Amino acid sequence: MNAYFAEFFGTALLILLGNGVVANVCLNKTKGQSSGWIVITTAWAFAVYVAVVVTGPYSGAHLNPAVTLGVAMKGAFSWELVPGYIAAQVVGGMVGALLVYIMYKDHFAATEEEGLKRACFCTEPAIRNYPINLVNEIVGTFVLVFVIFYLVGANITLPGTAESTPIGLGSIGALPVAILVWAIGLSLGGTTGYAINPARDLGPRLTLALFLGGTLKTKADWGYSWVPVVGPFIGAALAAVFYNAIM
């Protein structure tokens, strides 16, 4: 599997399962309606586990532009690959969100509240305060990326090659990373919905705005959209700088 395709496919799978549980909890007349935050955070952790297991051997399973930036700043990933990885991740997020809509189309139609429908695509804060919201995303992503540096190696041996290649996160322990995302969601996610991943938010938000906004009568809330993009990039950069400084 090509590394770029792996990032696309893995991110699409991540969003299908992750935003899928949000739709199951938030939309009307689903079997999981109103089952709560614990269900959402747990399923997101499982989604991370599944996506990482599938794509780890092929691309390092970044599945997150902030992780890609952080690993590159750490010096464990080629800057030449960064644009392609990020593009693949964002497009994967768009496709995953479209699949969620197809799966839950009737339930979207049965739901009138705009905020509930938008939540199935992208994040929004519980209390809108942009500086604090930005700090929340920075801190959450800092924890994610900094701990990932301790959980995984820097290199990966690609199929068909004999040498270790600095292509991504390496031979990844998917379960610890999933538990890490679960912990972030439970502890820090209640403020902004813990995007901690620009592709997780921007990709589905683009799908909503470009293809589904009129059908769902739901706006993409572009006024907030910069927070779950800028915040994770800052958090990842700080994690890389701090890790390099102390190691």
Predicted regions and their residues:
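Membrane-interface helix-loop junctions and terminal tails of multi-pass membrane proteins
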Residues: M1-M247
